[in-house]
């Protein structure tokens, strides 16, 4: 088994922040400069739909550490109504973030548009997108089973709204905020459980703590958004895979540089630390309201099994749960997850996908509606080459690509190219750490 040591200096730029920087740039007044923008398929899909609506977008490719490519992006806009009617469907490809958040901007435009995507995205629920926009006065049509395509007849007279999120969702919070920027009055988005707060930080929105423990994001209507520069830090969700590799591999020690350490994104690190993982955060600083730092991880053979059930922790670490499950199973032979039904509505049904593939490599699992448990290993461990189904989901593919480095059999992952959605240089970085 290989040992993994060294530094990762070119983590993929954070997808969540990059999406928002581009979308905010499209409604800002002036020129928005974004440094370290991602070349991954999802973020490029956001730039693509902006260009299809007439927004001027320019990209400059730069060669960074290890020869990997980063990008600077410049977006020119003239305020809320800079967009023009697209000539055809706006293709979001596999990016649910693009589809959901851009819908908030399209709802305020004086034209009709339609958001579509690949076969996976077209199966994902969009009722949570349509509902608040309809309440604000936009005409939104979905398929008969409330999935994409999302057809929007916008209006320049959106009504302000007080909207309580039915489930924690930073994407729905952001789409309502982007729509409410155009509305004729002040709006509020109310959260019972906190979700990613990048949109609030980037727009400088006020957040009020309510007496019952909830919080309210305040969005002023029709207040000009001045253009400003954004720098995209490293994606903590991508860092999770490197961290898992370091924790699982004997003798390994890895430093991941310039990671976004926003507390709404690092719940998974708290889960790992609570289980005895050797992880430390160093060189902490702040940029654009975001906490950034370096993460040091060492092989942790004494880790305890992970158990995740707190709804707030689930919401905070929803994207990292597949990797956490695979990590815990490989390290300890056990894992527990509850209150995570939302995982069934991601790029794949991630509960079933993880269970299926863990069973293929010799683990015993119990699956239920809102989670699953790994209860041990089968009496007979598979040998030779084992087929792993990525379910066309980048996080499933990467989770089992990490497992492939530490399990006794060879894993053959279907459609591994889907990893390019969020981490184009995944395999190159992994191999650069191998000693």
Swiss-Prot record:
Pathway it works in: Metabolic intermediate biosynthesis; chorismate biosynthesis; chorismate from D-erythrose 4-phosphate and phosphoenolpyruvate: step 6/7
Originating species: Chlorobium phaeobacteroides (strain BS1)
GO cellular component term, pick one: cytoplasm
Function: Catalyzes the transfer of the enolpyruvyl moiety of phosphoenolpyruvate (PEP) to the 5-hydroxyl of shikimate-3-phosphate (S3P) to produce enolpyruvyl shikimate-3-phosphate and inorganic phosphate.
Reaction(s) this enzyme catalyzes, per UniProt: 3-phosphoshikimate + phosphoenolpyruvate = 5-O-(1-carboxyvinyl)-3-phosphoshikimate + phosphate
Entry's family note: Belongs to the EPSP synthase family.
Quaternary structure and interacting proteins, as annotated: Monomer.
UniProtKB keywords: Amino-acid biosynthesis, Aromatic amino acid biosynthesis, Cytoplasm, Transferase
Enzyme superclass (EC): transferase
UniProt-listed GO biological process terms: amino acid biosynthetic process; aromatic amino acid family biosynthetic process; chorismate biosynthetic process
Signal peptide boundaries: none
Lineage: Bacteria, Pseudomonadati, Chlorobiota, Chlorobiia, Chlorobiales
Residues that bind phosphoenolpyruvate: 15, 96, 124, 171, 350, 395
Localization per Swiss-Prot or TrEMBL: Cytoplasm
Binding-site residues, 3-phosphoshikimate: 15-16, 20, 169, 171, 195, 319, 346
Enzyme Commission number(s): 2.5.1.19
Protein name from the UniProt record: 3-phosphoshikimate 1-carboxyvinyltransferase
UniProt key word Lipoprotein: no
